[in-house]
């Protein structure tokens, strides 16, 4: 067996010795067996040839060099591509951030400007009140001291002030100047004493005569009922008593304690003058004063009728400006809706990685420019309307209109709206319309536990979204807030809400979850449901003020 096995083995060895070439080829054909020795023999066979004639490396060295070059080139391309994409992202963020900053800063600047104007108006009103009080004190002191020059100086200041206010010297201007002089002559101190009464108490006949010429009444009463004649007789000023009697002072007028000027007179000469005075002269003077008062009343009535005629054209102007303002707000509302659609299209293109982002971004820029232009036009229209209303109020001489509804500050909104302290809202029966030109009320309500709906964005005004907001507010007993901003969007919201005529349980659908089952609508939570409307328009349309309860937000420390 061993010899048989040995013969093939020896034969194989002999075959390998006689034919070494096939063995090498056979060994090379077997994968993984003798390849490394063959590679080593190959390099050893090439070494003498390399030493004799140097050549470029071939085979695996070329592959490694090619891979290194390709790797370096790809890294370079990747770095450049990364830098390009970073630059594009930076430019995109800058392009998106700049409009966002401007959109955020624009209302802030408007709020600051509105607050500055309100503050300046309040400061001007306070300054005018202080100056008026100072003039009154100067007038009262000058009347008591008999300083006629100071009295004339105060009257001259008032005339100059009326001139600066634009009051002319025509019939209407003279009527207004006369009314101002009479009001200044009848001004009172904290005790109800007029300048004429102070002049009588000081015994100043010239000052008494001057005040009477300006229209002051010689029979005015101060605290506890003393007349100027009473005070002059009590002080023993004979000349002042005589002048007052000639001007129509009635010696029969009693004070609150029942005493007459004759009883409190401190000098016998004053008593004798009062006793010997002819009362028929007093009656004649009283009739003349009554006739003068009637004449002034008739002049005031004629002046009022003339003002009403002039206000007719101004009323038409206010109506025209109101229509223009409503048209501007309507166009601005449409522009806001278009901007929201453009932003939604841009977001969808980015999410789907489409190559139309540049087009959508340019469309957003164009729409934002249109919104800014329409916003400025609406602001100008609102300012023109406010000035026309102010001019109309000044012409009718009605002063500042008494704004209907409630007034509160931002810090009091929780008590007024959420708690309804005093049951003012419940007693009125209307839902509140919060009027806040600065927008602080909207920020306050947004961060409360409320369902906040931004009416400028058309998405929340869809029936499905509004239905969920209303149902959620009823289910969890939360206020539902509609922010109208600067636009007149109340009719749009009203149409959406009036479309829901059923009761809240009829709003439920089979697809709703268990949290909206009928058993979850508890009466205790439903009592906390509120409906609020917030607007930045200072003077909303009359229709809104009739349907809703106005709640005006004032600045801290002011009456505005």
Swiss-Prot record:
Key word DNA damage present: no
Domain named IQ: residues: 62-91
Cited InterPro entries: Ankyrin_rpt (IPR002110), Ankyrin_rpt-contain_sf (IPR036770), P-loop_NTPase (IPR027417)
Coiled coil: 281-398
Region Disordered, annotated ranges: 1-72
Keywords of this entry: ANK repeat, Coiled coil, Repeat
Sequence ranges of the ANK repeats: 191-223, 224-253
SMART domains: ANK
Pfam hit, one: Ank
PANTHER family: ANKYRIN REPEAT DOMAIN-CONTAINING PROTEIN 39 (PTHR24171:SF9), ANKYRIN REPEAT DOMAIN-CONTAINING PROTEIN 39-RELATED (PTHR24171)
Name of this chain's protein: IQ motif and ankyrin repeat domain-containing protein 1
């Amino acid at each position: 067996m061993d010899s048989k096995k040995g013969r093939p083995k020896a034969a194989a060895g002999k075959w390998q010795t006689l034919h070494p070439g096939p063995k090498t080829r056979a060994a090379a054909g077997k994968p993984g067996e003798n390849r490394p020795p063959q590679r080593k023999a190959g390099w050893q066979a090439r070494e003498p040839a390399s030493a004799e004639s140097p050549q470029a490396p071939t085979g695996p060295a070329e592959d490694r060099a090619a891979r290194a070059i390709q790797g370096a080139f790809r890294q370079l391309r990747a770095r450049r591509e990364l830098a390009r994409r970073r630059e594009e992202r930076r430019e995109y963020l800058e392009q998106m951030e700049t409009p966002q900053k401007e959109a955020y800063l624009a209302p802030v600047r408007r709020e600051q400007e509105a607050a500055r104007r309100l503050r300046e108006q309040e400061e001007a009103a306070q300054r005018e009140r202080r100056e008026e009080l100072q003039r009154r004190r100067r007038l009262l002191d000058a009347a008591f001291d008999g300083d006629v020059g100071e009295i004339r100086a105060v009257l001259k200041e008032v005339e100059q002030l009326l001139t600066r206010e634009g009051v002319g010297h025509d019939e209407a201007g003279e009527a207004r100047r006369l009314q101002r002089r009479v009001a200044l002559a009848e001004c009172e101190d904290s005790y109800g004493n007029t300048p004429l009464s102070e002049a009588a108490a000081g015994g100043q006949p010239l000052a008494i005569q001057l005040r009477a010429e300006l229209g002051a009444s010689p029979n005015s009463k101060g605290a506890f009922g003393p007349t100027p004649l009473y005070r002059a007789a009590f002080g023993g000023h004979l000349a002042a008593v005589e002048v007052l009697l000639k001007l129509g002072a009635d010696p029969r007028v009693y004070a609150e304690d029942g005493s007459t000027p004759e009883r409190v007179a401190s000098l016998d000469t004053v008593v004798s003058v009062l006793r010997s005075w002819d009362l028929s002269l007093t009656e004649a003077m009283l009739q003349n004063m009554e006739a003068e008062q009637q004449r002034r009343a008739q002049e005031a009535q004629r002046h009022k009728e003339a003002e009403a005629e002039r206000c007719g054209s101004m009323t038409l102007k206010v109506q025209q400006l109101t229509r223009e303002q409503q048209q501007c707000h309507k166009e601005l509302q449409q522009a806001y809706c278009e901007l929201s659609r453009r932003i939604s299209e841009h977001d969808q293109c980015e999410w789907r990685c489409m190559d139309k982002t540049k087009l959508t971004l340019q469309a957003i820029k164009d729409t934002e420019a249109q919104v800014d232009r329409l916003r400025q036009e609406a602001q100008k229209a609102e300012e023109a309307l406010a000035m026309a209303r102010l001019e109309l109020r000044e012409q009718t001489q009605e002063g500042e209109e008494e704004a209907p509804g409630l007034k509160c500050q931002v810090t009091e909104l929780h008590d007024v709206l959420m708690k309804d302290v005093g049951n003012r809202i419940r007693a009125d029966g209307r839902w509140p319309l919060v009027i806040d030109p600065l927008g602080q009320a909207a920020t306050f309500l947004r961060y409360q536990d409320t369902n906040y709906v931004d009416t400028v964005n058309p998405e929340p005004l869809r029936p499905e979204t509004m239905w969920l907001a209303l149902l959620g507010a009823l289910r969890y007993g939360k206020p539902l807030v509609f922010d109208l901003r600067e636009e007149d969007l109340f009719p749009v919201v009203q149409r959406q809400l009036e479309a829901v005529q059923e009761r809240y349980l009829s709003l439920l659908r089979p697809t709703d979850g268990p949290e909206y089952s009928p058993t979850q609508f508890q009466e205790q939570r439903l009592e906390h449901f509120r409906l609020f409307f917030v607007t930045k328009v200072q003077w909303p349309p009359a229709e809104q003020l009739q349907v809703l309860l106005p709640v005006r937000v004032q600045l801290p420390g002011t009456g505005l």
